[in-house]
Design a protein with these regions (language model features):
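Acidic, proline/glycine-enriched N-terminal capping motif
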Residues: 1-142
Length: 142
């Protein structure tokens, strides 16, 4: 295993780029909430890498977003959700959690996110919201 980190708190999915016009030129930028969350992931990744260089080989990444069940959910169904038999079918989209995680780990954990050959993304309910990222050496399927 190359890296395993847990970021406590409500996971933040990658926001769509925002656009502004200045002096007749359009400029795209990442929303502030997304930038702050990616900075938190970067700090955790730097600490977990402990001075090691970014990996320059194929990697397998697993991203799991744990979200709190809605308060409006009936108690019985809420318990089922926490046990794992009920899955979250709400927004934000699952892939946006992975985009935020991969962009934050880019050039810190792996040289470039093009080195990710396998990606497992999950969204689950939990009383303790968090995002977990695991990076392992890629499998040789040849």
């Amino acid at each position: 295993m190359i890296l395993s980190i847990t970021i406590p708190g409500v996971p933040v999915a990658k926001g769509r780029p925002k656009f502004t016009a200045r002096g007749g030129f359009a400029r795209a930028y990442t929303p502030a909430k997304t930038q702050r969350y990616e900075d938190v992931i970067r700090c955790e990744a730097v600490a977990a890498m402990a001075g090691r260089d970014p990996v320059d080989e194929a990697v397998t990444v697993s991203v799991t977003a744990y979200v709190v069940p809605p308060k409006s959910m009936p108690k019985k169904r809420r318990l089922e959700a926490i046990e794992g038999s009920v899955k979250p079918l709400t927004r934000p989209d699952l892939d946006n959690y992975a985009k935020a995680a991969l962009d934050a780990c880019n050039a810190i954990v792996f040289r470039d996110d093009s080195l990710v050959t396998d990606l497992l993304i999950r969204k689950r309910y939990s009383e303790h919201p968090r995002l977990t990222i695991t990076v392992e050496a890629g499998e040789d399927y040849a």
